Amino acid sequence: MQRRIFGIETEFGVTCTFHGQRRLSPDEVARYLFRRVVSWGRSSNVFLSNGSRLYLDVGSHPEYATAECDDLAQLVTHDKAGERILEDLLIDAERRLAEEGIGGDIFLFKNNTDSAGNSYGCHENYLVTRAGEFSRVADVLLPFLVTRQLVCGAGKVLQTPRGGVYCLSQRAEHIWEGVSSATTRSRPIINTRDEPHADAERYRRLHVIVGDSNMAEPTTLLKVGSVHLVLQMIEEGVQFRDFTLDNPIRAIREISHDLTGRRQVRLAGGREASALEIQREYYARAVQHVESGDPSPTTQYLIDLWGRALDAVEQQDFSSIDTEIDWAIKHRLVERYRSKHNLTLSDPRVAQLDLAYHDIRRGRGVFDLLQRKGMVRRITDDGEIELAKDSPPQTTRAKLRGDFIAAAQEAGRDFTVDWVHLKLNDQAQRTVLCKDPFRSVDERVERLINSL
């Protein structure tokens, strides 16, 4: 599949403090955040005019699901637009709090763990064809996803009984199964629940829930782009060395705790391999695969970054990736802060810095401050992100949904939408079923919009 549909769902951590003390419960904060949404959408689960879905997930976590994208840079832009949309809600909620005499600062964190040890996710979605054996996709992908944190982790200062440890991944400590149909109860690496949100005879939706939420645009690009390339190779019948892991859950934690990438993990046949070895195998195949075609500049950059990230780990010199890969950017930040103030990794101020990296409020969040200083590389720009807050991707089904929502809202009409249905809640209950996620032009939708 040369052209693929991608989407990212991100759950955000939320808290409200007043002079450093917790002010409101997460439930109360979430209610303030979503008050504006509920006032126009009559629900805390809505689709927006840019084709995305915004809702309150289990445990009072705001969640943003991007519209269907068919281009990696487009996906990065729409993922960032979600941050800006939630930042707007945050600013509005703080204003309401002030009007009601409740002082306080609301924080939204694009991370995966809170101080109490709870975890919330970043789920990636990939459209795959129904043809072929899905179990083979899972078998080939699992070792790749377990080791991908080496190049895509968000980084985390983990507090252990032996003191603070710098880890590659936030999510690794919270994954309990390899492949499963549940997402919250068991937290697998690949979710197999078959909900394609498309023509079920032609497509499946691969739902990957092991990844970290990323702040750095190049890391998001590499995270999704590398999976896309591995899927392409599986679809084309490329054979990979067998890296089936003896215990994927133990392996994912062991790899996260080892910045050298050299720690050996047990494979199913009794052999051992390191995360670096496993990633090198997938990377080498990806290079061959890409060079056999006519790669776009984005794909060329992706392959270059992937290779540089592996080289940086192998050489233990992260300076070549510490403006592009989240865990390396944060590692540089933490190490400079520690040496300046003579701190250990167990110091609460280091934990505070770790958290502040993921604060999405511009002008306050540490990642944004680094970006303003030109210390992190961009894939998109602020103008594109601003546009994506209101406009859907123009090349996928999201355009149909976004255009319908915008037109219905402008006409003051009552409507219901989901990923595949567009429905006018009038006497006729007119509904259009959009089963092809690649289709951005549909006469039935045009007729529905023209009838408003």
From Swiss-Prot:
Keyword Iron-sulfur: no
Gene Ontology annotations of biological process type: modification-dependent protein catabolic process; proteasomal protein catabolic process; protein pupylation
ATP-binding as UniProt keyword: yes
Catalytic residues in the record: 57
E.C. code: 6.3.1.19
UniProt: ATP binding residues: 53, 66, 419
GO molecular function, one term: magnesium ion binding
Top-level taxon: Bacteria
Pfam family, one: Pup_ligase
Residues reported to bind Mg(2+): 9, 55, 63
Involved pathway(s): Protein degradation; proteasomal Pup-dependent pathway; Protein modification; protein pupylation
Keywords for the protein's UniProt record, in alphabetical order: ATP-binding, Ligase, Magnesium, Metal-binding, Nucleotide-binding, Ubl conjugation pathway
Protein purpose: Catalyzes the covalent attachment of the prokaryotic ubiquitin-like protein modifier Pup to the proteasomal substrate proteins, thereby targeting them for proteasomal degradation. This tagging system is termed pupylation. The ligation reaction involves the side-chain carboxylate of the C-terminal glutamate of Pup and the side-chain amino group of a substrate lysine.
HAMAP family associated with the record: Pup_ligase
Note in the entry: The reaction mechanism probably proceeds via the activation of Pup by phosphorylation of its C-terminal glutamate, which is then subject to nucleophilic attack by the substrate lysine, resulting in an isopeptide bond and the release of phosphate as a good leaving group.
Family to which this protein belongs: Belongs to the Pup ligase/Pup deamidase family. Pup-conjugating enzyme subfamily.
Identification of the protein by name: Pup--protein ligase
Name of encoding gene: pafA
